[in-house]
């Protein structure tokens, strides 16, 4: 009941202030206001939400989820941070006497220990999808549907990423009331959105190596399949056992035929060399005489055919005629007279025999 009364008093307190006016507070008022804000935080967090999967009540801020340094609320501390509808942090945007701009992005932290300024604080408490905003005009509670956060853009300055662990706010020298950040822990039942983790360059190399290994394994598997198929191919006709004896016998016959052909060719070459005159040699040598005599002797049974013009080919008849006339001239020179005389003697002998026979017949008749 005390919390409810305190909440109503706190919600009605800023409505008495004029709209759009900067309120300056003293350090005591600031301390009291910080205390009220902390009580309001505890009250808001104790109210359970009705979303599915988030039925767990939040605990008191005095436990381990609300560990943080004790810092002053408005001590020369400026936070400018881009806040989405799902951030679970307490934003402190003090307004100093000078004109202060509120950029939408970036994170700056400035601490000035010497200068003290009067400022008006602005708080925004947004655990899960329930947002409580305290304005100078009128406080209200709005419930927004969770919207997907845009992907974080890379920034040159290092920024602490929010995780499930509670984050801490840097402290200022002068101790004051606690300023805690509402972290989205498991006790609060709020699910923190997963951050996009940039891919490292080594992941692409690992993917390439894995794909390369898979390609090599595929090639080796195909080679093994082809090898197994080759082993299962049926044997050709020449490798069947029933044909091996015939193939072996055919090979032996072929070897013998080749040997006989080589021997016959060698013999023919030798015979041709013995029957023909070697080119470029003179006819007066002993080698020529031996060659001619051997040739005529080996062909003595067919000399009548060889020397007959009608058996000689047309392109060789001129040479054959010259050879025959040469042989006739050689063989017939110096023997013509002897032959003529021999023939005369034979004729005379025949005439005498005839006369003797004729006289003998006459005597028998008388």
From Swiss-Prot:
InterPro entries: Equatorial_segment. Glycans are attached at residue 129. GO terms for biological process: acrosome reaction; fertilization; fusion of sperm to egg plasma membrane involved in single fertilization; sperm-egg recognition. It is found in: Cytoplasmic vesicle, Secretory vesicle, Acrosome. Residues 1-18 form the signal peptide. Keywords: Cytoplasmic vesicle, Developmental protein, Glycoprotein, Signal. GO terms for cellular component: acrosomal vesicle. Its main location: cytoplasm. Glycosylated. In testis there are two predominant forms of 77- and 67-kDa and a form of 47-kDa, whereas in epididymal sperm from caput, corpus, and cauda there are two forms of 47- and 43-kDa. Testis forms contain complex carbohydrate residues. Epididymal sperm forms are N-glycosylated. Then undergoes significant glycosylation in the testis and that the majority of these glycoconjugates are removed by the time sperm reach the caput epididymis. Residues 144-157 have a biased composition (Acidic residues). This is Sperm equatorial segment protein 1. It comes from Bos taurus (Bovine). The lineage of its organism: Eukaryota, Metazoa, Chordata, Craniata, Vertebrata. The gene is SPESP1.
